[in-house]
């Protein structure tokens, strides 16, 4: 618990240094690895804005979702912030960020009207409808399609991961709602 509090406090300090463009007010110059902030001892990397745990992503999602004008900010890999209320979509070890407003199109979870599934277009409303139906036919169809070669999650999904877990969690949450 204490380590988490320290990381949250550090994230708050870093947040204060971030400008609206998502880059630190003190711009890093080309540095060698000695000056790169190392991940926490357990390998986790936290969002510099909100302190949420980052998800490592490769070039596929970055190329797909980041506007060309800012794509060079995160050339090889980055971390994705899944916190829906955070303004940061992607960030790197230098705390350079790509903001949600700098993405090519609206994406879930930042925009609930955007598809949860980037490959097949399943939306929050589809999951909500399935939670009220006798059988979750849309979700079953998505599960079937997600195992097919048509699924391109590593490139199309905002986090580079299959959405099935997110869809199942949302379904369970909505099923319990009155």
For each feature predicted by the language model, list its residue ranges.
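N-terminal amphipathic/basic-hydrophobic helices that include classical n-h-c signal peptides
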Residues: 1-30
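Short cysteine/histidine-rich metal-coordination sites, predominantly Zn2+-binding motifs
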Residues: 61-71, 96-109, 132-137, 170-175
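Short metal-binding segments enriched for Cys and/or His
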Residues: 75-99
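Long, compositionally biased
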Residues: 147-178
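Short, flexible, mixed-charge glycine/proline-rich loop motifs
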Residues: 34-42, 70-75, 108-111
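Short functional micro-motifs and their immediate structural scaffolds
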Residues: 55-56, 86-91, 122-124, 158
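Short cysteine-rich clusters marking metal-coordination/redox-active sites
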Residues: 47-50, 81-83, 117
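Short recognition patches in nucleic-acid-associated and regulatory proteins
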Residues: 46, 51-73
